Amino acid sequence: MTSQTKLLLIDGNSIAFRAFFALYNQLDRFTNQDGLHTNAIYAFNNMLEIVLKSVKPDAALVAFDAGKTTFRTAKYADYKSGRAKTPSELLEQLPYIKELLDDMGIQHYELKDYEADDIIGTMAKRADDAGWQTTIVTGDRDLTQLTTDQTTVQVTVKGVNELEAYTPEHVKEKLGITPTQIIDLKGLMGDTSDNYPAVSYTHLRAHETCADL
């Protein structure tokens, strides 16, 4: 029996952010001779080594956001507008994280007007259709909607080295819904992190089903 091809997809911005804050209390300790902060680079590299050893992927890709402007902000200008600016100490490390990936032979990709999530979602769907076994590593629980029988989403719990594996069964156990229903739930409840509002109670009372909305 032929074994499944294994694909590893990593949410670059999300993991870099969590890597940075995992060692934020040691920020001054993690600097090189030129004054470059290295805490995110160090923690990101540790996470990579652990995940690569665990998953043993045949192919791997790290997706990054291409910028603050996306097709979503074109439709809704306030999308993610409430978020604090990315710390300069983290921004200066991102090019070196990408250089680290190059040195390890791991591909990374970003696409204008799209987020890393969009790249990961597209790649995961294509891999699923091809019968591949996919592991997604992220700090964003929104990506648990991508779980299938062949796709597992590993979400950071503490720092970047402790991960919680989400399968369709685990999503059902924790949320009481299926992965495909997460998008409906988020649409109804809104998301303060992404700065979009919930559907009002008046609208919910006026319609019997999500389809009617």
Question: What kind of feature is each model-predicted range?
Answer:
Residues 1-107, 158:
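Domain-level signal for Mg2+-assisted phosphodiester chemistry and nucleotide/NA-binding surfaces
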Residues 17, 71, 144-146, 213:
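Conserved protein kinase catalytic core
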Residues 2-4, 28-31, 81-205, 211:
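Extended two-metal-dependent nuclease catalytic cores across DNA- and RNA-processing enzymes
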Residues 18, 207-208:
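Short, cationic motifs built from Arg/Lys/His that form the positively charged side of catalytic pockets
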